Amino acid sequence: SLDGVIQAPGGKDEDTEGDFTQGGWTFHYWHDEIGVLFTQVMSESDALLLGRKTWQTHGGAFEPMAEGDPFGDMMNAIPKYVVSTTLTDASAWRNSTLISGNVVEKVRALKAQPGKNILMDGSSALIHTLAQNDLIDEYHLLVYPIVLGGGKKVFADGTPLKLRLVEARPLPSGVVLTHYTVERPA
């Protein structure tokens, strides 16, 4: 959203933590270009990093999907890393590996491996932890023309970032596709 909220974009009851009642706020703004962006960013990545709630939401949608849906097949095939302090097993969604304890060091080790990008989706607490530890290189943000007035946000208070705009593209629905890289001191 314009005020940085990323909580429960996909459904009314997706994440009601903190008495959040605005779930499902992205549906009115869907445009096929959003799907194209998701597919493009996924194809440039060889791993998906998610917090537990986002992993459970996505897994509940994609794991039972029959083969043949191009995006569903891509989501099920990509290696997934779920960060959680409460899960003991990640077998509910195929190709998933559980990360618990010392998340920063484990993500740093993942980033050091050869390969393409590691994509994160949702997972505000995880985003905050990784940003505070300088482990995010790029942000692909969809900015929706709505102010929700509260909820979990993409950027944590007290964590300043300098970003460089790579791309901004408005869609007919009013959503703006943005791509930023993190500027680091030389």
Residue ranges and their predicted role:
Residues S1-A186:
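Enzymes that bind and transform nitrogen-containing heteroaromatic metabolites
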